[in-house]
Amino acid sequence: MKSILLAAAFLGSLCWAGTNPYNIIPEPVNVTTTSGTTKNLKIIHEQKVAGLGNEGYTMKLTPGGVELRYTTPNGKAMAMATLFQLQDQLSDTPEGLPCGSIQDSPDFGWRGMMVDVGRYHYPMKEIYNFVDAMHYYKYNVLHLHLTEDQGWRLPVPGYDKLRTIGAVRPSAPENQNNSLLANEGMYTKKELQDLVAYCKARGIQVLPEVEMPGHNMALAASYPECCCNTKRAQVWTHGG
């Protein structure tokens, strides 16, 4: 999953690498440089101020360190993403980075990526790695596709068959086309709560998706009484 973000970021960087002295992705609204360089990216001053918007921030790079200003916690989260990119660049720039100022705010309020955990139950560690990459490049919506014909990943109190049946995809028949690997798993309430908190601290909103009435074979296999046509009521082992 992370490779998709990295590939998109690399292609984007080719477009503006020549005009962005800090090579920040996405390109900030305004960048100005001053004389001198700095190797010190420690935050020496930060301040909440009015007027920078929900995700806007300003950053000043000086020989003594970094000064931040933002209006909301989301603005600080975006500033930290920029700082992480600058830290990576500094490790490859022994002479230091140019001193200067960065002012930024997004053109689009919704910058989302989807993870299809319905068709494949990804370990939480992989999802956290994906969130870290999203934050690095300032995406702000994690769309979690939690239910599908091929699996159900959302815990629902009192409906245990969603875990024992709906969350388990068996191996596909040998002669089946478009087969999927066997896969099983359901996230716990605590895991999802922790993920939401982790994302919030990075300026990312979690959008959970539960498909209904279509793409509900995992539900139908678990509780046929919830569906009208139960002839195909099984967790699908093929794509679709």
Task: Identify the function of each model-found stretch.
Residues 116-149:
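A conserved hydrophobic secondary-structure block that centers on an alpha-helix together
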Residues 1-7, 11, 15-111:
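Acidic, contiguous N-terminal accessory segments
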Residues 108-111, 138-140, 200-204:
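Short, well-ordered coil/turn segments that N-cap beta-strands
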Residues 79-80, 125-127, 144-146, 153-158, ...:
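Short, solvent-exposed loop/turn and secondary-structure capping segments
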Residues 111-115, 142-144, 206-210:
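Hydrophobic faces of well-ordered beta-strands that scaffold small-molecule active sites
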Residues 67-69, 116-120, 181-183:
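Second-shell loop/turn segments in exported
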Residues 150-201, 216-240:
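Aromatic- and acidic-residue-enriched carbohydrate-binding clefts of CAZyme catalytic domains
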Residues 130, 195, 206:
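Aromatic/hydrophobic pocket-lining residues that form π-stacking "cages" and hydrophobic walls in ligand
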